[in-house]
Amino acid sequence: MKVFKFYPDNRAKFHFGDSSGKLKDIISSDQLFSALYNCAVLLYDPKEVEKILAETSHKILFSSLYYGIRFFNCDNGQSQEIFFLPRPLAPIQPKDKPTNLLNHKIVKKIKYVSLGAFRLLQGAWQDEEKYFNFDLLDLKILGGNFACTAEEVEGLELDNDSFEKIKLFTVNSTPRVVVSRLNDEAENFYYQEGMEVIYQQMGNYLISPFMYFICQGDLDRRLTAIIRFAADEGLGGKRSQGFGFLGRVVEEEWPDDLFLTKGQYYVSLSSIFPGLEEVNNLLYYELVERSGYIYSKYGRSLRKKQVRLLKEGSVFSGKISGQIVDISPEAFNEHKIYLNGKAFLIPVGEV
């Protein structure tokens, strides 16, 4: 299992948006695929890109782009990293344990759980009741939205108060104005939002966020070159204003046991466009909309076809594949516009 990690600089800015223009926490797998496809068109001839897509579309799966937290010890130069995955959309609660209002609010804020916590969730699935018999309050909560096991932060000389104060990003609103091309008059005043990376110094540790995604399958040199080019080209919107640069790229290998074992149920780590025969496997899910205009160096910016996808963290009663969908506008013939709705799944429950 190949993992690509990106280390943005302190104060790096990002604009990850949805179809309504609102900020998102992450880049979903379909958006990541589109960004890589656009970078491939910049690097290679469109016919070569079609060839690469045909060769790899059924062999390689991409997860969405997720966050990690890096703890760098400034005294000894050692670093420790924690990787986070989306919280499953199925209920997560301890059996026969009442929850008060304060604890409910704390648990509700958790959006991401660490790899170690996900391993615990895999064994906590209750087949008959269809929920996770697990207490999220047993985990260490970082910055309110992230949760990990005590073992994953063992050895760090930080207390619970320090963990709660961890902040990876801040959202900035910048005033903007639309200037008419005809008479240079200001027409509309608005605010543009963006996320800004924050490095924090706590005790001996420099705490910083990084981003990563997982690839399942064999990558050739062309795809690796495209991914590295995308880090320089940038991801998300407002790149002409300096947004989206991912910084240093690091590749590493992960063992397959967490992802390729058999399970009773599956949780998605990607956005998914299921086939008609796969809809019956839906258990817990949320829908997200994809629309907007195409981004291409060829031709005009036309509105692409609107689709709805299953959100990361959706739970399925069986393994599904998803599909790649052609969303090209009818009037755009320079090259195809694809949406990657392939399913990247992680099993839960014992077989």
Language model feature labels by segment:
Residues 1-351:
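Conserved active-site/ligand-binding neighborhood in enzyme cores
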